[in-house]
């Protein structure tokens, strides 16, 4: 009997861990390995099948990705938001301090994965796109670089932003009431790069500026991309809540 009791107690303690980073590490590994595979695919088929949009191989190796990723990302974003809303805490104001602390740690993990996803999309693949267009004369708006950058990496980090926002909104008391301006900026700002893509491609039909990547037409990418810095405001809000949860005694122990 005592053995059974101790086993149950150990299991309860295991599920009561405040800092469990396994979810974050799994997310980071999956994300980075996926993008490394994508980059290798680009290297191989960008030159072999990505230079002529009228060629059959372009349809096979590139447009097939485009027609698959767009609905998949849309469904994933809606499904994630729906799941987080459906499983929301119906009595979030009554959550225990220890559980709230655990949820804050989970939120930080969401934001970490989001930050890495933004790096891949708004930095790595975006800079790569500039290099591509300074090297290759395109005959379509749906270049291999764009199919990966605009229609894969941007929606992926936007889906993660949806997850982070809905997680905070449905499970953490501090964010459940009202809306955090910093959180709205960090979630919506980088997403707005996607509508900006429409303006960008429209502009390219009138002005040739592949070699002028700093042209005003491209400023929207920078403006909305830098809104990701709103994450510092969210982190300050999280730290303020942690300070309130651990109290003066906890702060003194950490000082």
Listing of model-derived features with the role each one plays in the protein:
Residues 59-78, 106-110:
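Interfacial helix-start motif at the membrane-water boundary
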Residues 29-47:
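Alpha-helical transmembrane segments of multi-pass membrane proteins
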Residues 1-4, 69-85, 151-164, 221-241:
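Hydrophobic cores of alpha-helical transmembrane segments in multi-pass inner/ER membrane proteins
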Residues 2-31, 97-112, 170-185, 240:
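Alpha-helical transmembrane segments and their helix-start/interface "positive-inside/aromatic belt" motifs
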Residues 45-64:
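Perimembrane loop-to-helix junctions flanking transmembrane segments
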Residues 180-255:
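C-terminal transmembrane-bundle signature of multipass membrane proteins
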Residues 112-178:
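Membrane-proximal helix-loop-helix units in multi-pass membrane proteins
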Residues 102-137, 186-210:
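Hydrophobic alpha-helical transmembrane segments of integral membrane proteins
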